[in-house]
Amino acid sequence: MSADIATIQAPIPPLSPADFSSEDLRYPVLKQHLEEFQLWLEHAFKAGISAEALISARSDYIDQLLQQLWYAYRFDKISSLSLIAVGGYGRRELHPLSDIDVLILSEQPLTPPQAQNVGQFITLLWDIRLEVGHSVRTLEECLLEGLSDLTIATNLIESRLICGDSSIFLRLQRHTFSDGFWPSTEFFDAKIVEQHERHQRYHSTSYNLEPDIKSSPGGLRDIHTLLWVARRHFGATSIDEMVDFGFLTAEERNELNECQSFLWRIRFALHLVVNRYDNRLLFDRQFSIAQLLGYHGERNQPVERMMKDFYRMTRRVSELNNMLLQLFDEAILALETNEKSRSLDSEFQLRGQLIDLIDETLFIKEPAAIMRMFYRMAEHEEVQGIYSTTLRHLRYARRNLSQPLCELPEARQIFMDILRHPRAVESAFVPMHRHSVLGAYTPLWGNIVGQMQFDLFHAYTVDEHTIRVLRKLESFANENNRPAHPLCVELYPRLPQPELLHLAALFHDIAKGRTGDHSELGADDALAFSLKHGLNSREADLVAWLVRHHLLMSVTAQRRDIQDPEIIKQFTHQILNETRLRYLICLTVADICATNVNLWNSWKQSLLRELYFSTENQLRQGNTPDFRERIRHNRFQALALLRQDNINEQKLHQLWSRCHADYFLRHTPKQLAWHAHHLVQHDSQESLILISTKPTRGGTEIFIWSVDRPSLFAAVVGELDRRNLSVHHAQIFTNRDGMTMDTFVVLEPNGHPLASDRHEIIRNALLQVVLAPHTKTPKTRKLPTKLRHFNVPTKVTFLPTHNERRTYMELFALDQPGLLARVGNIFAEMGVSLHGAHITTIGERVEDFFVLADKDHKALNKKVREELSERLTATLNPKDKI
């Protein structure tokens, strides 16, 4: 047994391959030995043995196994033939399910019998369930292919002899590390490009909530890149050896080892949980991994704590990776040595495009100088980063601060100067966050670094999301972004103090992860911070108000009936003035865009625009809208449009006389004209389906005219769900003759309006639904696997209203196939009539808003509300989650 395995105090150590008999090398016995070893790895890990020890043990085990089989197949009798470990196996990094990559190296091409024997050897390895990747090459083939392929070259650089002829392996090593085979400068440049392309695939952040432990920025590949570069240039075979060559300091070595150890531990646990090779921390695995690693807490706390540790580690890896590669480029490869530095002021100079300290002790002597450096970066557009040695001094000074930087009066003044600079975000705040200076400035920021939320809605950690909000706000100053965000690009330059908006953005989620309402807690923090930084009470109050109400506009637009003047009146009373409204719309749009790349769409844009202009109009008028005047206006404007088409006004009068007042109140003149144009030419007793050819509120509007019947809404939304369309808005009306006049706004799964080539298919499908004599209960699809790991208890809330004819209901539930149809069926069974709906899907949960009445057109009484709540809760709490 190897020394590594023998010294590990784990349950029942397995038999070492070095002690295998010829009987042990037979297929069934060998397979059993491997299964026992894999089981031992799992038990040993759960017993507390370190991942490092077990990874080393597996590498030793596989080495010894391959050596035994090499001799069993008599490959040692073939001259100039060797078995070489490459890739992760070459680095001795074998996790439970890592691939075992080997190179069979020969002087001359193998003879047919030799090749057949090698094939049988590899087949046996596959049969015993080893994931072996292999290549069989001559020395000349290796070098030729390595010259043209960076991956092969990298494998050769980190190769390791397992058994066989050592002389041919040493010749391979000499050629691989010669100046003619990927010189250091070329290898370095190629690895930088490779890393950049890999980071781009992961959106340049490790903060995606389902990261790849190996390949995401800050993951193990970033450590490997450092090892590869040092291995090629110095011949260093480990992180420890990199210190001996001056590539990194002892402190950096310790930090890198700590990060690698943590990532190895998570990856090891992941392999045990999934039981197949994969490096992605997907949602459905995170809870099991957190438990295996010993994280505790209520509900989602184990996952959130584990992921917070993960993100903080990957931040450290990213910073070390960037700094050390830059140092290697600048100092060791000595690129552009003739370039002279240029003074920026008495403290900082410019080396190329990088800012550099003149006095290396400045940050220690004057911590406020850290803030001065970032202000210089905002001031000087030519500065694109920080010089590597200055980064080292920054890291050292940051870790030796005696107090947060915000306690220094000079630092506070500089912070506000940065905040007021038009290039503050990209040039200062982004690098301040990247190098952990924001956390050093205020512990409030440090608390949210790496803070994730275990859901499908928030795509980034709280700190990453906040930086993206700031970036989006700064983008509103760019006229090129007007097509995407016309209202915000119009308003942002007119804000009297945009720095107040940026400060509110910085604090809007600062209290996430704490017990209590994060908006209220964050508002208190923002107020104290603002006053401490010299803002007057009016300015500080505005910042705190924005933080406290940063969700108000989004919730109102998406989960309230914004065509109800009473809702607009209530919202306006909370806003109070146009200044607040302008700040809030910009913050709201930026917040939505920075939450999830798929969240923003033309539907949400249209809702927010409508709410903004309705509120602006209300603020300017200063009185409650006259419903009757609005109805008269809508009818008059619609009639004007219809007269352009020579409408039959007698038939129009007959149609409109059968409609209730609400119909004219809640439709625009264009909608009224569109409906009437088709209905006056149509048999009033025949069903009609209209689909808008132009986007309405960013979606496609579907209008249904049909004889009303119970569960018609459920049947329609069930069919739309079956056709993979999402309903975002519904208005339900029945005229005096019992004909439905229902409107649905739908979107494709990509958030776009209905594709034109699907119009006729959808129209015919809906016509079949409304013509059917009975409503068929649609087949409910199974709950998607991704959703089964989330617990969203169904919650029904009835909102207060002064309207005696309507009940406003909010429904929070787990998103699930056929949800709207099931809700509609319950309404029908209870005799509850639906008059409107806003449908909002937020990750794994729905937050829907319904306007309801009883059969007598009155608000629901207490008994009906209680029964409705009970039935919805019982029906929508998923029972097939496992």
UniProtKB/Swiss-Prot annotation:
Cofactor names from the entry are: Mg(2+)
Where are the residues of the annotated region Uridylyl-removing?
A: 344-700
- Look up the EC number in the record and give it: 2.7.7.59, 3.1.4.-
Question: What InterPro entries does the annotation carry?
Answer: ACT-like_dom_sf, ACT_dom, HD/PDEase_dom, HD_domain, NT_sf, PII_UdlTrfase/GS_AdlTrfase, UTase/UR
Write out the entry's keywords from A to Z: Hydrolase, Magnesium, Multifunctional enzyme, Nucleotidyltransferase, Repeat, Transferase
Q: Does the keyword Magnesium apply?
A: yes
Activity regulation description: Uridylyltransferase (UTase) activity is inhibited by glutamine, while glutamine activates uridylyl-removing (UR) activity.
**PROSITE patterns membership:** ACT (PS51671), HD (PS51831)
Q: Which GO terms describe its biological process?
A: regulation of nitrogen utilization
Q: Which SUPFAM superfamilies does this entry report, sorted A to Z? A: ACT-like (SSF55021), HD-domain/PDEase-like (SSF109604), Nucleotidyltransferase (SSF81301), Nucleotidyltransferase substrate binding subunit/domain (SSF81593)
Catalysed reaction(s)? [protein-PII]-L-tyrosine + UTP = [protein-PII]-uridylyl-L-tyrosine + diphosphate; [protein-PII]-uridylyl-L-tyrosine + H2O = [protein-PII]-L-tyrosine + UMP + H(+)
Superkingdom per UniProt = Bacteria
Keyword Transmembrane helix listed? The answer is: no
Q: Name one GO molecular function term.
A: phosphoric diester hydrolase activity
Q: Where is this region: Uridylyltransferase?
A: 1-343
NCBIfam families per the record? PRK01759.1, PRK05007.1, UTase_glnD
- PANTHER family assigned: BIFUNCTIONAL URIDYLYLTRANSFERASE/URIDYLYL-REMOVING ENZYME, BIFUNCTIONAL URIDYLYLTRANSFERASE_URIDYLYL-REMOVING ENZYME
- Biological function: Modifies, by uridylylation and deuridylylation, the PII regulatory proteins (GlnB and homologs), in response to the nitrogen status of the cell that GlnD senses through the glutamine level. Under low glutamine levels, catalyzes the conversion of the PII proteins and UTP to PII-UMP and PPi, while under higher glutamine levels, GlnD hydrolyzes PII-UMP to PII and UMP (deuridylylation). Thus, controls uridylylation state and activity of the PII proteins, and plays an important role in the regulation of nitrogen assimilation and metabolism.
**UniProt similarity note:** Belongs to the GlnD family.
Q: What is this protein called?
A: Bifunctional uridylyltransferase/uridylyl-removing enzyme
Species per Swiss-Prot/TrEMBL record = Photorhabdus laumondii subsp. laumondii (strain DSM 15139 / CIP 105565 / TT01)
Q: Which gene encodes it?
A: glnD
